[in-house]
From Swiss-Prot:
Secretion signal, residue range per the UniProt entry: none
MF annotations from Gene Ontology: 3'-tRNA processing endoribonuclease activity; ribonuclease P activity; tRNA binding
InterPro entries: Ribosomal_Su5_D2-typ_SF, Ribsml_uS5_D2-typ_fold_subgr, RNase_P, RNase_P_CS
Presence of keyword Nuclease: yes
Protein name: Ribonuclease P protein component
NCBIfam families: rnpA
HAMAP family to which the protein is assigned, alphabetical: RNase_P
GO process annotations (BP): tRNA 3'-end processing; tRNA 5'-leader removal
Enzyme Commission code: 3.1.26.5
Top-level division of the source organism's lineage: Bacteria
Catalytic activity: Endonucleolytic cleavage of RNA, removing 5'-extranucleotides from tRNA precursor
Family: Belongs to the RnpA family.
Length: 119
């Protein structure tokens, strides 16, 4: 499956990141911190990614971002719309496989009620 994070699904501007940090709610597990901000007027969700330089060099950070984007692409039908999310990767992500990243994201999304329940 290709990585397909269209422009409408991304947060890029610093002031948009800051709004989510300041006004949003956060949930975390050992691998990720996820901030969420409700935006009722928005027809879809948007994602912003942050991977600190403390985690590793550019190769490691970009690998983590690619895995998170791919997981979000696969989960996009299950993620609630009308919200902005900022996902911050923590140190343990550097050694994780794609399956572990996806499982961890599902865990933190379910924990905070951000993920739609599909039966």
């Amino acid at each position: 499956m290709s990585i397909d994070m269209k422009k409408k699904h991304r947060i890029k501007k610093n002031d948009e990141f800051q709004a989510v940090f300041q006004k949003g709610k956060s949930n975390a597990n050992r691998q990720f911190v996820v901030y969420q901000l409700d935006k009722e007027e928005q027809p879809n969700f948007r994602i912003g990614l942050s991977v600190s330089k403390k985690i590793g060099n550019a190769v490691v950070r970009n690998r983590i971002k690619r895995m998170v984007r791919q997981a979000i692409t696969e989960l996009k039908d299950e993620i609630a719309s009308g919200k902005d999310f900022v996902i911050i990767a923590r140190k343990p992500c550097a050694e994780m496989t794609y399956e572990e990243v996806k499982k961890s994201l599902i865990h933190v999304f379910k924990r905070s009620g951000m993920k739609r329940i599909k039966k």
